[in-house]
């Protein structure tokens, strides 16, 4: 809160709310002395005592820890007050033992929930066996993961994947894809004329120089300009502009089938078909960035698997859920693309390490389960039922629902950041994207009861922001990149 009440004023009230949930008995005296606190402070104390997870006070253990660490950290993020230290399933706890229901999954990372028992077991076992040996040598798990990704992609209706490059993150996966597209273009046109790369407004492909050059937001590109030359930017879902955008000079086109950071914008089938057709006409590589929307978040292993074969890409990039919190990424390519890559063209020191690959092998095996994918679609339907009710309650605020599966966006007519604050102080973590959009990317294992619980909290938070008197400050920084305003 903007004017946080010091913890010593509310500690007595908060102690009454024990972790067991058993209320303490209070006996009123025959005559209660009137409070000597100013009315504003008294109201603030009463309000804070009524919240399930009020943000830590300025004199709290949390604040002291943050203040001691902040001077040593490069200020790349704006963070809200809680400090998280423990997670289980769809819940996460801060260092003062406040529990939060997590609708963010670490930005679509923890698809199997926090501290999944199988993931934890593999981390323990493999860390005692072999963690890293470099890509100068073979290990049992890099090839096993690559084979599994290829086989599950084909079984799940995805593109003609043939080979895999394993790395450490989504940005690295996209950097590899960009390099592979450039190499493909050089193979077709050795004079280097086929070098241009195309991406789209509203996209987010990463923060390294290549992936940032593919992310056309002037606010974030300008401090690091000039960008890598050869990038062109088009309008998402604009079929009419494709032919002028993608030309004989184009070596590659990179697109998110569902834009995550951009606002949960879904590419139309017609647009993706036209894009594939044009890439084939000019001999350009089509790259689908499925880092956020892939690995069964849409109800299929890959979002593009819902498309006709004629719309499928040549390269797919993935990360996030691939490691369920462990840093790992991958770039999947067709045999045609792979045939242009030779020894020494690309590499990584840590990528493909046996620890990460063994983890990812377990995770992909489980996320590719058809029953899990069916459940994702059932859970989407449950979320949408709640969205209908919330729209009926706030018809002037809720404008649209976008997305597929468990990557959903609720478009608001007003700034959503106060809702983020109000939800967090009531026990729910949710994030934003695009412009005035609430983003829902919970663990894929979330239960119906947890969905219901979270949506009840969200409605309460929206009621506090849009109907009750008083100011709730916004929580900024709850998305990777905020659109220019």
Give the ranges of each region predicted by the language model.
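N-terminal mitochondrial targeting presequence
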Residues: 1-48, 483-485
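Conserved N-terminal phosphate-binding loop of PLP-dependent enzymes in the Aspartate aminotransferase
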Residues: 31-485
